[in-house]
Amino acid sequence: MVSLKSVLAAATAVSSAIAAPFDFVPRDNSTALQARQVTPNAEGWHNGYFYSWWSDGGGQVQYTNLEGSRYQVRWRNTGNFVGGKGWNPGTGRTINYGGYFNPQGNGYLAVYGWTRNPLVEYYVIESYGTYNPGSQAQYKGTFYTDGDQYDIFVSTRYNQPSIDGTRTFQQYWSIRKNKRVGGSVNMQNHFNAWQQHGMPLGQHYYQVVATEGYQSSGESDIYVQTH
């Protein structure tokens, strides 16, 4: 999934991104980013959790914030999208999550976030569809946490959209050997393992449990929490 987005460049244009669909509700009560074939790009707070949503506008995809920490995504013949709920800023917290994830084609379920200085987009892949993102990235090593083996990879995106506009930046990947949809993810263990393999992080921006899809169909219904 070489072109499987690297973005959420809408971070600098949140107010305009949400203006039309949210005219009828307060920003902190944005339960329905819906009623269109493609949910408009947005980020903000909902029921005490940070959410972020981005798509390239292709196909049909609907993101909905539900009660508490729960969200839902349904997509059909989509382009590229990524979105989910979590926290801002990201930390080494232990994340509990669960729910349902059923991609028909390319898709990821991951703890997903960004840092600045250095600018890094990171993924802890818990499950994926037909494409393993490690297949086109540089293998760095393996470590064990949260009941399974994770393989570590790094890749570089050149002149691609990011939280700071069009930039060149690295992507860090931890990919779980045995896919799952539910469990605990100790993010500090991943951060430590990346550091040990020469993959430093910077100042954290958001950190969400995200659903991502690319030229596929499917649905997910995910909740998140911490210990």
UniProtKB/Swiss-Prot annotation:
Keywords: Carbohydrate metabolism, Glycosidase, Hydrolase, Polysaccharide degradation, Signal, Xylan degradation. One of its GO terms (biological process) is xylan catabolic process. The active site is at E121 (nucleophile), E212 (proton donor). InterPro entries: ConA-like_dom_sf, GH11/12, GH11_AS_1, GH11_AS_2, GH11_dom, Glyco_hydro_11. PROSITE patterns: GH11_1, GH11_2, GH11_3. Its EC number is 3.2.1.8. Pfam families: Glyco_hydro_11. Belongs to the glycosyl hydrolase 11 (cellulase G) family. It comes from the Eukaryota. It is an enzyme of class 3 (hydrolase). Residues 37-225 form the GH11 domain. This is Endo-1,4-beta-xylanase 1. It catalyses: Endohydrolysis of (1->4)-beta-D-xylosidic linkages in xylans. GO terms for molecular function: endo-1,4-beta-xylanase activity. Residues 1-19 form the signal peptide. Pathway: Glycan degradation; xylan degradation. The gene is XYL1. It comes from Humicola insolens.
